[in-house]
Amino acid sequence: CPADAIAFNTAVDARRCYGCGRCLPACPHGYISERDHRLDNVAIATLIAEVRPDAVEVHTAPGRSEAFDAVIAALAVSRVPLQRLAVSCGLEGHALTPQALSCELWSRYNSLRRHGLRPLWQLDGRPMSGDVGAGTARAAVQLWRRLSPLAPPGPLQLAGGTNGHTIDLLGVDEYPAGVAFGGMARRVVMPLILEAQARGTALRHWPEGWRRGLALAEALVRPWQARCLTTDFC
């Protein structure tokens, strides 16, 4: 469990679970079930107004354009000036062609532009799996290559299965606009998060742990920064 939400001889800790679903097929006895946890659109607008983030990520799926429109309308109600609206979507589990996925993204693009939002396309190669092994990195790179000529305007970011091996899979002339480390980053810093909790505090309030966490995160990011500085794409 990338969120460390399942301990030996205990149930799933709902406070830590973020719904990746990796445990569902992994349990041989089928003891783990899933349930929805949803905020209505009014609650979403209220939450965003309170937190006032610089950007928001919205996960979407084929055939969910109306639900997407409703969420975007709720974000607009919050009146928070977002710098970017990240849209996360991929092919896995949807039996789509890249062309069909691009049509879905164009639909989302039209919705975003109606509300004056600037999109960032987060191409989910193999969702929430970067900590599983080196091979998961391939799906994100392959999806980026297939969607690059088809996607609507906006930066295309690698996601879903990204890890320390992702950068080695790119050609010398291939430059995605960004990379998101989810499962891999969580695996790297989770021991520090748990240690901070054992100390009765949060990681960001524990100076030594915070410094160690930043060093671990920088180890993931630094190769991309070095690569970026050698090009005109950044």
Each model region followed by its residue ranges:
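Iron-sulfur cluster-binding cysteine motifs and their immediate structural context
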Residues: 1-13, 22-39
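Short Cys/His-rich zinc-binding micro-motifs
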Residues: 16-17
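Conserved mixed alpha/beta catalytic, RNA-binding, or beta-rich assembly cores of soluble enzyme
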Residues: 25, 32, 37-201, 205
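Extended, intrinsically disordered, low-complexity segments
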Residues: 185-234
